[in-house]
Amino acid sequence: MKHRKGRVEGEILRELTKIIRKNIRDPRVSNVTFTAVECSNDFSYATVYYSLLTEDEQAQKEAEAGLEKAKGTMRHLLGQSLTMYKVPELIFKRDQSVIYGSKIDRLLADLKKQEQDRQN
């Protein structure tokens, strides 16, 4: 059953990526990238993780509002492309791993610079 769940999650991720690029014209979601999908065991809910190219708080709120507005359209189009008995309800959550990774990169770059300054 886990293997099927993984396949379905991957298919939902691919289809949602296509949908947001081709069918959703809202400029608030133009910088949104879907990173992962986690489905409930009965496939009634799908948590969709997304990231943004910016760390601007206002842009994040606008993107969240744009995704919430487009949720119904995305679910409808997802239902047309998937062969499932029931299309899962979409729940959007911000993926914090991208922000965390960039902070780690900055810290490592700072440490490297400090090390080079000590050697000189």
Curated annotation (Swiss-Prot):
One of several proteins that assist in the late maturation steps of the functional core of the 30S ribosomal subunit. Associates with free 30S ribosomal subunits (but not with 30S subunits that are part of 70S ribosomes or polysomes). Required for efficient processing of 16S rRNA. May interact with the 5'-terminal helix region of 16S rRNA. One of its GO terms (molecular function) is ribosomal small subunit binding. InterPro entries: KH_dom-like_a/b (IPR015946), RbfA (IPR000238), RbfA_dom_sf (IPR023799), Ribosome-bd_factorA_CS (IPR020053). PANTHER family: RIBOSOME-BINDING FACTOR A, CHLOROPLASTIC-RELATED. NCBIfam families: PRK13818.1 (NF010391), rbfA (TIGR00082). GO terms for biological process: maturation of SSU-rRNA. This is Ribosome-binding factor A. GO terms for cellular component: cytosol. Belongs to the RbfA family. Gene3D superfamilies: 3.30.300.20. Monomer. Binds 30S ribosomal subunits, but not 50S ribosomal subunits or 70S ribosomes. It is found in: Cytoplasm. Keywords: Cytoplasm, Ribosome biogenesis.
